[in-house]
Amino acid sequence: MVSSRRGFNPIAFTPWPVTILSSLVYLALIIPIIVVHHLVPPAPKESPAGVDLEEAWHDLQHLTRQYHPYNSHSNDEVHQWLLKRIHAISATSARSESQSGPEVFVFDDNQTNLTFSSAGVAATAITGVYFESRNIVVYIRGTEDEPGEWWKSPDGEPSGKGGVLVNAHYDSVSTGYGATDNGVGVITTLQLLKYFTTPGHYPRKGLVLLFNNGEEDFLNGAYAYSQHPMSKFTHTFLNLEGAGAGGRAVLFRSTDTEVTRFYGKSEHPFGTVLARDAFKLKFIRSETDYHVFDGVFGMRGLDVAFMEPRSRYHTDQDDARHTSIDSVWHMLSAAITTTEGLVSYTGDAFDGDSGDGGKLNNGIGTLGVWFDFFGSSFAVFQLNTLFGHSVALLVVAPLLLIITSVALFAVDKMYMFSMYTYISESGGQVSLYGLRGMFRFPLILGISTALTIALAFLIMKVNPFIIYSSPYAVWSMMLSTCMFFAWFISCVADFARPSALHRAYAFSWMFGIMWVFLVIATVYQKQHGIASSYFIVFYFAGVAVATWISYLELFGLPKTQDYARRQGRLSDRTPSSDSHFLAPSADELPSSSSAAGRDFNPEDVEDEEPTESTSLLRGQQRTTFANYASARGSQESNISNQGNNSLHPKDHRLEQKWSIYLMSSAWILQFLLVAPIVIILLGQLGLFLTSATYQIGADGGSQLVIYIGIAVLSVLILLPLFPFIHRFTYHIPTFLLFILIGTLVYNLTAFPFSHSNRLKLAFVQEMDLATGNNQASLVGVEPYIHDAVHAIPSVQDGKISCTSHGYGGRTKCSWPGLKPKVAEGPYKDWVSYNISQTKDDKITRFEVSGKNTRACKLLFDSPIADFHVQGSVVDKRIPHTGPKGVSEIRLWSRNWENTWTVDVEWTKKNSERTGKVMCLWSDDNDLHVIPELDLARKFAPWWVAITKLRDGLVEGSYSFEL
């Protein structure tokens, strides 16, 4: 007898196709996502026209030779070097004989000053600031700009289309060389000057390049720009910044959709709207000059910055050695594309009433949504578009399922949610087992999620800082935990109660869960302008279609009445005693041709409905769960000869008898509808969030949130596998079990820091100039702060005092330090001050100066009502006082050893007028100037990096009482 063998179906819903295909899809997407996230696109071997990458690299090396904070002599050297480079580039830019280049105007701003404050904090006293500008402003006149030098007139106003601003601050922190914060931004801006003064690249609209000084200490340079005439001319901006040390330059923030589209045309765009929402919701509290340009001036623009690793940020590893020419090119190429688009745009999108009184008339933008695909393409659309699609999906998707369900009931094919059906002729009851597996998915999801999140609490309890150097070990642990236990529970459930409706019920549960998530996301889109929930929209759309397909599959089943009649005829037969124990062989199953010639169905060879006399053993006897895979495999081989290709090959004969009619290949369509877009969007989001947060523990941030976030993201990334995971073979889950064990042991026992991921400890030395007593301090996290402090030779046991109050999750440990040598002469002469009062005692005048410094402070134990610095400008757009008063006044001068005259108005509640007069020193380029800092750098453990705590490395002060 010749058997009719069915051809092999490589996408059948059987263990090997499901295991292999789904694994390949995950690997094919996750690996490129990781590679793109960490590898920077290579710079071209030959510099493109208008730029010189070799020159840019040499400029970066020169710029980062020394620490150059605002309050240092090296900062003056950088200022002079920048002026020299700007004039050299302007003078040597190529010009054709037939066309002259654009006019270039260089403003060395040595006149602007401003008094302002940390406005916006109504519940507490604020910090007032007086700052004198050391900015350099370069204006490249656009080919369509109006001629003339309008800025020379006191009342001069620009005309025509607004210009474009590119900003980069050239000061560094006192403990970092500033290669990426913000050397690459400065070098990029210099190359933009070269590019837009090269023939063929002249800007149509005016371009202003701002090299601002003083960003690190309070965004001072950007605030001072508000008083420069060019601030009235620029309507859009591109801010270049660095909050890491190398890698790709990320689009941190953007004010609106319109400006973002120009960035989206970059060759290698990188970023997601999630970063903007994190700033908006105050999850990220540090700020860049973007805050001033957007919030104070009302300009429209973008914030492009480096973001990782944070362990090198503001340390001596922020140098040229730890970045690359590839990183320079990544920022430069994005800046060229974005700026070229902005200066070439002559439409009206950035002109007109902004609806915000007192700010620029640069039109009204629309909130946007954006994200990149593999660092090579960029999606940009309006938030209103996302909201519209969200609402449509919330309404249409449930209606579609309801209509489909009604249609299934109408044609008598709704097997889901059905326990029994009745034979209309005899009234007999036939079991459909349609509820089998209905509550399996929430059990699988709940247990696997709970176990994954439990690991987050375990790591926090035992080794909370392991993510600082080993984020991928944490990711591997979370993913393998979720995957293994989801598979294990699925297999146990499938072994005990096999169900052909597992897929349909799983997708139905996913539909309900994601629908709730989408409701929440839609509310936040509308009420709070939060766009980072875009992945939920795509997630729900894929799940909705996949769920609908599961419902459509039911139309291929026989009517429940027809099925009941067949079962009724089958029940009239008297089975042999062995029929309960032995499954039919392949030869006993009818071929499709023989089935057509007689009244026989494949269901006829299935197990009978259970009764009181039914054997406890199933037709296909399985002795142990260990034989799960081999039993499944034997079932699959036993039925390989039956049926035609259009029917389900009855892969698992213990499922419901009617399941033979279900499509065997529908699963692959469902999987491809959900998994790829989820892997891409959530994979990129997960890595972005990890890069932004995995080292915030050194700053006192909560790491539990990070671990729980990774756990939840792991579940969401693997969730598309849950409807199919019971079909997986044991091979990959077993391998993941070993990964789980290995990474768990590592994460619980490994030392959390490394040479490339050092723990940052913040240094400050406070000196009482009246007594000469000083306290050197390191601020960091427990328990590592104690190991670092005790490693310093000058620290004596018994003289260390530690406190955690007021340091945001960190501990400050102080000890008597070696006296600094930041100024000449006796330390009592380092700060000079004079205090005088008016006759009515309402105003007190402070005259303050410091040796070898241009930064001082006035600190008040009780907030004052107001203050005025002689010679200062006040801008009504930028308040310098608040409703709760001012507790601190920071004074910055462009000149060394300047004398500030400050008039202070006391509040009526100021019965005790006490405080401190303080000056700061931040220049640590010479050894032995701050010997205690030298010792900390030299003798602290290898896994420690020293950074600054406040504006000054050394603070010398006198107390006063009036």
Swiss-Prot record:
Zn(2+) 2 binds at residues 181, 216, 314. Its EC number is 3.4.-.-. Disulfide bonds: none annotated. Keywords: Glycoprotein, Hydrolase, Membrane, Metal-binding, Metalloprotease, Protease, Transmembrane, Transmembrane helix, Vacuole, Zinc. Its cofactor is Zn(2+). One of its GO terms (cellular component) is vacuolar membrane. Zn(2+) 1 binds at residues 169, 181, 241. The record marks 313 as: Transition state stabilizer. Pfam families: Peptidase_M28, PFF1_C, PFF1_TM. Residues 602-611 have a biased composition (Acidic residues). Residues 37-390, 462-472, 525-534, 689-704, 753-962 are vacuolar. Glycans are attached at residues 110, 113, 834. The active site is at residue 215. GO terms for biological process: proteolysis. Residues 568-617 are annotated as: Disordered. Belongs to the peptidase M28 family. This is Vacuolar membrane protease.
